Structure formats: C-alpha cells, structure tokens
C-alpha cells in the first residue's frame, strides 16, 4: 500500500485528488495521513469527501476514514465500473471543477455519466468556463474528447450550480506541446447570474480594451442567466494559438467593479502569454497527470509549489522518469518505462 504524507509540500486537497485519480487508474491502494495538517481547518472537508465518494462509486472501492475532519484515509480501489450514472452534490462551497479534474482522467472510455451539483464558479478553483474553453480543448489536442453540459451556474456562497460530464472518450498517446504557436484569436465568456446584464457587458468591454493591443480578433460572448439560486459574475478568456491555448479567468465579488473583473482576467492572460509557455499556470498543474500517464512534454507558465507537490505524488504511483527544468516558464517531460 502506498503511504502518503498529506502535509507534504503545499499540503492541500490536491494531494488527495491526485492520489484518488491515480489509485483508480493503476489499481494501487493508498493510505494518506496528516491530511491538510497545516491548514486552518485540518482534515477532510465536505468537498474532499465528495471526491472520495465519487471515486468510490466509480471503482467500488473500500475506504476507511472517509468522514469530515478525518486526518487519515485508506482507499482500496477495485475495477472501474462502466456504464454508470453518478449523481453528487458537493455543497454550496464545493467546487464542481475540482471534481471534474479528479474524475475525468479515470473515466476515459468507461461510459460513465456524472451529474455534479455545487459551485461552478467559486474562488480558488478554475471556473467552469475555463474548463470549457481551455481544459477540455487542450485535452482534445492530446486525443481526449468529453461533453460538458452546464445546466445551472453556482456561485459562492449559495451554490446551486449543476453540470453533466459524459462521453469521455479517446485514444490518448505521447504528446508534445512545446509552444503556443502564432496567436490566432482570443475567445471568452463573460457571465452574470441573477444580476443585471450590463455587468457582463462591462466585464467584456474592459477585457476587450486591454486585449485589443494584441492585434488579433477577439470574440467574447455574454451568458446572462436570471432566476439562478446564487448571484455572481465572472469572465474566462482563451488565447488560441496554432498549437496550444493559454487561458485566464476572474470572478466578481461584492464591491469589485465589473471593469476590474474584466481587466484582471485580461492582465492574467497577458502575463501568462509573456512567459512564452505553451500552457498557462492552471493548465501547468492539470496537464501533468496526462503527461505522466501517456508520456508527454510541455512548457508550463510557472512551477508552483502546487505543481511540485503534484509531481511528487505522481511519482509514487507511476513508474516514470520526470525531467523538469526552469521555473517561469518550466519544461516538464515524462518518460514511461
């Protein structure tokens, strides 16, 4: 059984999520202890338990310690169950997108359909539009297709969002994403839920003003939804090159002007573009598991402590050689033995 110190490195929920994903894919059980030991509210929280529950449902796993506040978890996976429908509610503050990241690599070609309720656009995790515009599009480039249906949006603290992820199929193989290539267009989605439509327009116009100096077409659409459970706004952007995609997002909050939201996302996008990386700081972390599973290399925007921690967990499950060089940007290469 693989032993994992949950306080290692950045010591957050990503250690658990990566472990769950790779445990199911490899069939290797693990024990994680000191879960989130250095955080203000240590131990498993509700959103972490839903990741455990989802993976348990998919693989009929045996578990011990899967309860709120637990600082230790044992997870013993069995065979992944195909042709499965799973419904889950990760709570008002729970991130739908973090669940998608955890589950998706493990259900490729398994005919699993998952309905997730919770927060689609919440702090400290990628927004659902980033997942649609960037994450899923880059996965398509490496041979993985997935259908995502955004039924309702959910913002902190009320939640109420709903997403279906299904038809996750493909034949991924070794890949090389070492440059963005010539920038061709910037796409985006500016949204509001149960707020005036002009907020989405102002976010969009603010981002467009800053991005116009890049000299490429800009296509930002607005998504205005009234009558949602939660109120909120945000914008996600994707700079599409001939070979890869760089993304960024920003969320509104009380007291934060719509123009600031749009400007923030645009400046994050430009900062990532200026690193000359092939993928942005979010995707630098998320692509690592796919590169490690199939053999791949890419240039990430920044080697964060989060990415470094992820790398060390991956090496516990997979017999691979990882070469990393640089910091901002960094080059990641995984070779499968």
From Swiss-Prot:
GO cellular component terms attached to this protein's record: cytoplasm
Source domain of life is Archaea
GO MF annotations in UniProt? ATP binding; RNA-3'-phosphate cyclase activity
Per UniProt, the keywords (alphabetical) are:
ATP-binding, Cytoplasm, Ligase, Nucleotide-binding
What is the protein name given in its UniProt record?
RNA 3'-terminal phosphate cyclase
GO annotation, biological process? RNA processing
Q: Which reaction does it catalyse?
A: a 3'-end 3'-phospho-ribonucleotide-RNA + ATP = a 3'-end 2',3'-cyclophospho-ribonucleotide-RNA + AMP + diphosphate
- Record's keyword annotation contains Lipid metabolism: no
Predominant subcellular localization, coarse grouping: cytoplasm
* Enzyme Commission number(s): 6.5.1.4
List of residues binding ATP? 101, 282-285
The compartments listed are: Cytoplasm
Question: What positions constitute the catalytic site?
Answer: 306 (tele-amp-histidine intermediate)
The kind of enzyme this is, by top-level EC class, is: ligase
**Keyword Glycosyltransferase in record:** no
Its family? Belongs to the RNA 3'-terminal cyclase family. Type 1 subfamily.
Query: According to its UniProt entry, what is the function of this protein?
Result: Catalyzes the conversion of 3'-phosphate to a 2',3'-cyclic phosphodiester at the end of RNA. The mechanism of action of the enzyme occurs in 3 steps: (A) adenylation of the enzyme by ATP; (B) transfer of adenylate to an RNA-N3'P to produce RNA-N3'PP5'A; (C) and attack of the adjacent 2'-hydroxyl on the 3'-phosphorus in the diester linkage to produce the cyclic end product. The biological role of this enzyme is unknown but it is likely to function in some aspects of cellular RNA processing.
